[in-house]
């Protein structure tokens, strides 16, 4: 591809302002910039800062290849998560979501207008929760819009047709959105979709690959809303690290600790950035980890606030942790701040991942050949756990979704930990995850389906 052709095209990435969405579009932005494209990343100021601070797996200098733009929105409340809320959905983020949905359009429109006068073509890659970006792209004669699918493409099959043949053939259960998300969030999503209905979209970019979801990709392509659109399954978007990559400085303390552990001996425990465990559940999980006598790295932190820079940094678990860390010294490590998940999953000492089953975490874990102990919390996570355990066969279920309001006792958690780490059935799941990891990594290698789709996407936007 001629350099002048690449430089005459601007890619504008418009993420939804939540961690699991911010990082997927930043990974894609870095991939495209590494291929010589001019890439612009646009989000509210705290979320630009957050995305830059938390991205990992890349050479830090790579961020210099991205043009970052602030989308100014009015001030919004940034409360702490409500630990007494009846639903695990992070409804404390709704003021920020509402402010973004109402106000991000105008600064984005101004940015697109400005770029359209400087570049031959503008490709707007927007999180599908931001349909207004497609509307603004359609106002420009030299712009195309592409939705980014930040969740499993199979989730879209269930959303459009819960009775689809693929679900029934594999015995998969899809839960209605109202069961797993707050009514306020579902209403916001539908309202935004209705307001932007009819905005032309040139195609769909997906953080998945045919090795994982090939059947579901074909099923979605056949659905009326997507017929005629171009599909680019370019995942995994996250870098694929070798164990050696996890040993480059500067290093997090947990990686130094992992260096001292035997191969495939450590359970990594983390529940993402939008989930909290009640104190009683923390105590039960702690008892399970201690009772299992397995090595572990446990990231114990509450859900992000809307503005992570407004957080106090104090842990509500300080008193509990002082005793627990003493009792498990040498066996486990508790991290109360941000942890480098990709490096942990790539590390040779890590055997498995107990997770909330966000799609980022699922695909990061599988791409490094690590099975998942599934503990879904909200949103698409119950579906991801269903896909993981009953379709990929690379996970074990810790907590069924129907028990999400219950405290899971230590004995039940410990049983799953021991199955994953010690039993023949757990070994089969771990072997299956390794096989999937090899297939996923082959997808992004030369000649792989995801590499081809990324090449096709770049070829299309630079045509």
UniProtKB/Swiss-Prot annotation:
One family name in Pfam for this protein: UDPGT
Reaction(s) catalysed by this chain's protein: cis-zeatin + UDP-alpha-D-glucose = O-beta-D-glucosyl-cis-zeatin + UDP + H(+)
Keyword tRNA-binding tagged: no
EC numbers for this chain: 2.4.1.215
Tissue-specific expression: Highly expressed in root. Expressed at much lower level in kernel. Weakly or not expressed in expressed in stems and leaves.
Keywords of this entry: Glycosyltransferase, Transferase
Chain residues that bind an anthocyanidin: 21, 91
Active site feature: 21, 127
Main enzyme class: transferase
pH effect summary: Optimum pH is 7.5.
One function term, GO molecular function aspect: UDP-glucosyltransferase activity
GO biological process, one term: protein glycosylation
Record flagged with keyword 4Fe-4S: no
Superkingdom per UniProt: Eukaryota
Positions that bind UDP-alpha-D-glucose: 339, 341, 356, 359-361, 364, 380-381
Family named by the database record: Belongs to the UDP-glycosyltransferase family.
Physiological role: Utilizes UDP-glucose as the sugar donor and catalyzes the formation of O-beta-D-glucosyl-cis-zeatin from cis-zeatin. May regulate active versus storage forms of cytokinins and could have an impact on seed growth.
PANTHER family, sorted: CIS-ZEATIN O-GLUCOSYLTRANSFERASE 1 (PTHR48044:SF64), GLYCOSYLTRANSFERASE (PTHR48044)
Name of the protein: Cis-zeatin O-glucosyltransferase 2
Natural source organism: Zea mays
Lineage: Eukaryota, Viridiplantae, Streptophyta, Embryophyta, Tracheophyta
């Amino acid at each position: 591809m001629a350099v002048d052709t690449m430089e005459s095209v601007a890619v504008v990435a418009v993420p939804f302002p939540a961690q699991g969405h911010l990082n997927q579009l930043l990974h894609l932005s870095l991939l495209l910039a590494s291929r010589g494209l001019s890439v612009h990343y646009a989000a509210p100021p705290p979320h630009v800062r957050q995305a830059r601070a938390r991205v990992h797996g890349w050479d830090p200098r790579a961020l210099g290849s991205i043009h970052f733009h602030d989308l100014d929105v009015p001030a919004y409340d940034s409360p702490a998560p409500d630990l007494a809320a009846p639903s695990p959905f992070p409804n404390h983020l709704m003021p920020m979501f509402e402010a973004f949905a109402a106000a991000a359009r105008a600064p984005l429109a101004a940015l697109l207008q400005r770029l359209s006068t400087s570049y031959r073509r503008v490709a707007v890659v927007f999180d599908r929760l931001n349909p207004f970006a497609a509307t603004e792209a359609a106002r420009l004669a030299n712009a195309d819009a592409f939705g980014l699918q930040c969740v499993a493409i199979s989730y879209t099959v269930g959303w459009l047709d819960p009775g689809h043949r693929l679900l029934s053939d594999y015995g998969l259960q899809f839960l209605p959105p109202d069961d797993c998300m707050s009514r306020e969030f579902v209403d916001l999503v539908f309202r935004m979709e209705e307001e932007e209905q009819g905005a032309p979209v040139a195609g769909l970019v997906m953080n998945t690959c045919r090795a994982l979801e090939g059947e579901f990709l074909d099923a979605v392509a056949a659905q009326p809303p997507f017929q005629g659109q171009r599909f680019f399954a370019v995942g995994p978007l996250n870098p694929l690290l070798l164990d050696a990559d996890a040993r480059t400085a500067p290093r997090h303390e947990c990686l130094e600790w992992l260096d001292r552990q035997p191969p495939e001996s450590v359970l990594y425990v983390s529940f993402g950035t939008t989930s909290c465990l009640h104190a009683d559940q923390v105590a039960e999980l702690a008892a399970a980890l201690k009772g299992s006598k397995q090595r572990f790295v446990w990231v114990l932190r509450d859900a992000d606030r809307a503005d992570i820079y407004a957080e106090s940094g104090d842990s509500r678990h300080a008193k509990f942790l002082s005793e627990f860390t003493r009792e498990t010294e040498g066996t486990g490590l508790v991290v109360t701040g941000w942890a480098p998940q990709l490096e942990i999953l790539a590390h040779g000492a890590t055997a498995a991942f107990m997770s909330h089953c966000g799609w980022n975490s699922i695909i990061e874990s599988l791409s490094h050949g690590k099975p998942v102990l599934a503990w879904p919390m909200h949103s698409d996570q119950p579906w991801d756990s269903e896909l993981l355990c009953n379709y990929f066969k690379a996970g074990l279920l810790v907590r069924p979704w129907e028990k999400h309001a219950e405290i899971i006792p230590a004995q039940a958690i410990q049983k799953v930990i021991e199955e994953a780490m010690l039993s023949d059935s757990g070994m089969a799941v771990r072997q299956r995850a390794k096989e999937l990891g090899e297939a996923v990594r082959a997808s992004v290698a030369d000649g792989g389906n995801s590499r081809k789709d990324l090449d096709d996407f770049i070829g299309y936007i630079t045509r």
